[in-house]
């Protein structure tokens, strides 16, 4: 995600065990975790948040559960499956993002009157064609036309330090070259060193792309010898949603939000730890008072 010669501000994140780590830390802090209790709606009393309505699915017969709370923090992620899967329209769960993230938090906030921003501007990511797994910047290679020409002017050979930023600048490139007949576009890793390819493979494991790694192993797809066709995936909602203030609070008093469902702050990994901590700390101090 960096131009050659400019500061590289993005870090690799080893998130393969993040759920285990976060759950362990939450339990250490004394957090009570309600599994199999998806929240259906938020509860407002006299214009302020008062709790949430959940559906208890822990038994054979579901039942509603009312959870009273002085403060509520929404961190339900992005909104996927609003559009058919670009690579496989008949398989909606073949999506680059978590198919369980369906915009529940954005909808719940909207239903109680929380201010929303940027919802009309969905985002499109990219990755291997048909096998929907995002993380194009994890690939250490350059983008090429079918005849071998470089797609962009930035680098002729990619390394783990400087990748090909072409499709960050020209984010519709994969679709454009199909539409104008010059495509498709391929990621070419054949010039990358064995050390960089090993680093790339490790990065894929860290970023949840293990299914892609397994598929390449099973099918004999070797990035050191084979180019991989890329495509632009279907639109989804990330970094669009509830508007928050500097403390992470929405326009509904007592309701906070962080992460992919926030509409006026950076989403993704850069956003949720920072504003998750800010919202959590602010909500806790406010509730204590």
Indicate residue ranges for each PLM-predicted region.
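Conserved beta-strand-loop-beta-strand element in the redox core of flavoprotein oxidoreductases
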Residues: 43-66, 72
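Mobile, glycine/GP-rich and aromatic-enriched active-site lid/loop segments adjacent to catalytic centers
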Residues: 1-40, 48, 63, 118-274
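Glycine-/small-residue-rich beta->alpha transition segments that form the dinucleotide
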Residues: 58, 69-71, 75-81, 261-262
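Short hydrophobic core segments
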Residues: 65-77, 109, 256
């Amino acid at each position: 995600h960096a131009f050659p010669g400019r500061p590289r501000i993005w870090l690799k994140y080893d998130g393969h065990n993040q759920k285990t780590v976060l759950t362990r830390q939450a339990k250490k802090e004394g957090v009570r975790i309600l599994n199999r209790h998806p929240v259906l709606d938020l509860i407002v009393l006299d214009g302020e948040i008062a709790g949430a309505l959940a559906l208890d699915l822990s038994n054979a017969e579901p039942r509603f559960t009312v959870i009273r709370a002085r403060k509520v923090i929404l961190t339900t992620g992005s909104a996927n499956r609003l559009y058919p899967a670009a690579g496989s329209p008949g398989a909606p769960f073949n999506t680059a993002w978590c198919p369980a993230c369906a915009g529940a938090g954005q909808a719940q906030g909207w239903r109680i009157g929380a201010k929303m921003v940027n919802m009309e501007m969905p985002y499109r990511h990219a990755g291997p064609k048909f096998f929907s797994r995002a993380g194009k910047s994890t690939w250490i290679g350059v983008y090429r036309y079918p005849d071998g020409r470089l797609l962009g002017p930035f680098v002729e050979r990619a390394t783990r330090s400087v990748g090909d930023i072409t499709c960050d600048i020209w984010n519709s490139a994969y679709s454009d070259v199909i539409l104008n007949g010059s495509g498709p576009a391929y990621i070419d890793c054949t010039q990358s060193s064995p050390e960089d390819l090993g680093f790339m493979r490790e990065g894929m494991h860290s970023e949840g792309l293990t299914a892609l790694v397994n598929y390449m192993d099973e099918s004999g797809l070797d990035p050191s010898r084979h180019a991989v066709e890329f495509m632009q995936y279907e639109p989804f909602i990330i970094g669009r949603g509830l508007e928050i203030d500097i403390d992470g609070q929405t326009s509904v008093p007592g309701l906070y939000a962080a992460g992919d469902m926030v509409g006026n702050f950076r989403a993704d990994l850069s956003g949720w730890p920072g504003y998750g901590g800010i919202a959590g700390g602010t909500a806790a101090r406010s509730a204590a008072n």
